[in-house]
């Protein structure tokens, strides 16, 4: 059997152009949402202005925080909390309940079964197909699967990655991914997820996990993370931009899958016996 490679004309240029345009628009709307958030919080001065790389603290402050490492007390963190103090805020424990998943260990990994999602599979834009699986006989999917509107938040490795689950998922997540179930109605889910991925929370994660050889963000520290509560209309404006971004990204994926199927069908036709 002989195989001939598909010619270039099999690739629909209009489809490719449309795909690229949608990705660009998706990125634009997401960045617009980020810009709106930072504009509301920082105005025109959201980039830190301090040039000092040290601060002076009383020992009582160090004793209270339980941290003696100098990195924890950098002026940029003081500047962040000073800015947040100008807004109504809540800690994560006052916004969402936190549920831990499981960490079965590599010895439990299989080539088939229940998909096992790890931190490396998650970005703020979605979850890629896992290449590791767990036995359905050893783990309860019903208890551990991410449910619709749950926010996944990474606490180990690449800490502080947040993703809002769009629909119930047929998978189990790593213990390094916390499940946040929001109960505080003062926050829209898309707004909260954006804040978790923003510099506002990333700096708090950096502050808490500084000095560790392997980054680890303790759930007790995550509970105390400060979230600014912007007025609901502003949250809804930000959420609309996020939703538009994700809708465009989903449509671009559909187009890409369609293009792949077209090429695969043409390749099959070009097999010559």
Regions found by a protein language model. Name each.
Residues 116-118, 151-154:
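Short hydrophobic-aromatic micro-motifs
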Residues 49-52, 104-113, 207-209:
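Short coil/turn segments at secondary-structure boundaries
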